[in-house]
């Protein structure tokens, strides 16, 4: 019996975030492609205006500090990940936790993580 697209979608839908990450890496290796987003060139002169009015920020966990357990709990609350995935992120710091969030949300996440003992960067 042949595997259908629905079978594949069902199987992919049941994977964890870490398993999906491994799957993407396997596709990249097997087919020699990259899953990285392609940057689109904007109109000339728009770069300076965009740099002045940055509205989207990335929250990066620089290090977990001494209170790793507390940081893992906060990472789980922020990202909605499971315990293992959150622990892997904390252990693998520096890692980007959230991308494209507002300045207020980025500062709130930074405050929560720093209260738990982590070092955080907003980019």
UniProtKB/Swiss-Prot annotation:
InterPro entries: Ribosomal_bL12 (IPR000206), Ribosomal_bL12_C (IPR013823), Ribosomal_bL12_C/ClpS-like (IPR014719), Ribosomal_bL12_oligo (IPR008932), Ribosomal_bL12_oligo_N_sf (IPR036235)
CDD domains according to UniProt: Ribosomal_L7_L12
Name of the protein: Large ribosomal subunit protein bL12
Gene behind the chain: rplL
Superkingdom of source: Bacteria
GO biological process: translation
Complex formation: Homodimer. Part of the ribosomal stalk of the 50S ribosomal subunit. Forms a multimeric L10(L12)X complex, where L10 forms an elongated spine to which 2 to 4 L12 dimers bind in a sequential fashion. Binds GTP-bound translation factors.
Function: Forms part of the ribosomal stalk which helps the ribosome interact with GTP-bound translation factors. Is thus essential for accurate translation.
Pfam families in UniProt: Ribosomal_L12, Ribosomal_L12_N
Gene3D superfamilies attached to this UniProt entry: 3.30.1390.10, Single helix bin (1.20.5.710)
Leader peptide range in chain numbering: none
Keyword terms, alphabetized: Ribonucleoprotein, Ribosomal protein
Protein family according to the UniProt entry: Belongs to the bacterial ribosomal protein bL12 family.
Gene Ontology MF annotations: mRNA binding; structural constituent of ribosome
GO cellular component, one term: cytosolic large ribosomal subunit
